[in-house]
Amino acid sequence: MRVILTLALMAMTAGSAAAQDRLTPDQFLDLVDQRTASFATFPNRQPVGTEQFLSRTRTVWARANGTCAYGVVTTGDGQVCFDYDDDPPGVRHCWVPFLRDARLFVASTSDLGEVQEVIDISDDPVACTQAPIS
């Protein structure tokens, strides 16, 4: 799967001389729709969690600690945002997707400086130690 991700990312950046290219939310969702993306901190590569994109608007987020939540995906202003059913009302997690050296990343818009790398995209479902809340 990693080879497929690398080839897809290389195709998206063909002809680009920039070392870092911002992706639109739709370009990001094109890569992960109906797939599962694994996220890690950057640059330390500590596991953060795995997100199964059930559709372009619904996910199951499995944190590294094994807990899970359903998410609603929205886009706007160049951001991909997630609202999880176990967060307090009004809490949103928004990210700006980008490519750097043919690797896929997301940068937080609320926690400045937080960057995560998508280290794998697969067709495997998420594994949770508990069922999502709703």
Please name every model-derived segment.
Residues 15-70, 76-134:
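Lipid interaction determinants
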Residues 3-13:
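Sec-dependent N-terminal signal peptides
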